[in-house]
Amino acid sequence: MKYFGTDGFRGEANVGLTVEHAYKIGRFVGWYYGANRGAKARVIVGKDTRRSSYMFEAALVSGLVASGADAYMLHVIPTPGVAHQTVEGCFDCGIMISASHNPFCDNGIKLVNSDGFKMDEDVLELIEDYIDGKGEVPLATGNHIGATVDYMQGRNRYIASLIASANFSLQGVKIGIDCANGSASSVAKPVFDALGADVRVINAAPDGFNINVDCGSTHMERLQRHVVEQGLDVGFAYDGDADRCLAVDERGRVVDGDQILYVCGVYLNKHGRLSGGTVVPTIASNFGLIKSLELAGLSAVTSGVGDRHVYAKMREGGYSLGGEQTGHTIFGDIERTGDGIMTSLRVMEVIRAERETLSQLTAPCKLLPQAQVAVRVVDKDAALENMGVQNAIAEAEAALAGEGRVLVRKSGTESVIRVLAEAPDQAAADAAMKRIANALEAL
């Protein structure tokens, strides 16, 4: 598609994604759902803490009400909160304004359908046609103009649902959380407070510009220091819209999404709660995870990269747990998309039930050394088709001699090529990755 990628319509604010785009999305969505139901559409809208999110919210909501839809404004909330409240409140559609883990200068618009799933591609194609001037939709007039509704109660209901999902106490547990100066800033602490935890929060003072800046799940160093210096039992880091979660164990070591899948998969299987005894990682997951799951008596079925593909594979096979190394973890029995705060609660459930530390729980999961880099390019397709790049990939694979692998793919959200190399030792992984990265950088 022209505008919508794997995680919505994303770009630099007022460059790749403009207020005109946001207004037109609102105009089409407001008309489309109203026409389909024969009555005013009800659309719920959330945002993250970027300065531009307020601008895009105003444009989007203007488009919605101009087309006759009622717009319910959740204000700042995690992306999974929008999906949750879309379903719980029986809304026609949910819209989240966020660029997730990207820098503050970027932003994005994600849409979910009434079932809380990412919007169907046929609807997104219709929106793209309207953005490009193919067809018109009528403006509402008189009492058919939509209303804007302050829907803070929706965020409170989402917080309450997170608390209610935990059937355990965290009394006496010292937990560090890094909110990335994003959507988790006003949501995560109340959840852990309600469960009795001693919560030590960092990076929860958003100013519109500091979202994801040297913090959150893409910059774990500060949380690692925080856990060690404060003597905490565990730490959790979210990204800008809190659909990702990575952890830090009591020793200050990062626990990535693959290890979280292992810990939760083994626990759920032990208690008969893992459908088919199967976990759904992605093709970018560490091969060590696959082997560790097999040694624990579990199966793994891989999906494409992206939580959309993970959940599609889970639905296809009736599986209940899947996720990505980056921290998108989906518990299919209770959610339809990755939820960072829910993930941290599920990890705490395992820690409390098994009476083990996070380092003890992850110890059996033996991951292979990896080297990863994202190389910015002008044309992603041309870069992958370049003969020099293809030769570098072949040479890297030959050097690994079947004892490792390389994965080179284009990002679905940024103009970058992602390079992953995996090998029995770190030096070999680094060498394979650098060989390919150098070829890409030479373009």
Listing of model-derived features with the role each one plays in the protein:
Residues 1-62, 66-67, 148-175:
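An N-terminal, well-structured beta->alpha segment
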Residues 46-48, 177-179, 249, 333, ...:
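Short glycine-centered, acidic/aromatic-flanked micro-motifs in structured strand/loop junctions
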Residues 125-159, 164, 250-323, 330-331:
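Proline/glycine-rich low-complexity loops and linkers
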Residues 4-5, 45, 71-75, 96-97, ...:
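General beta-strand structural signal in soluble alpha/beta enzymes
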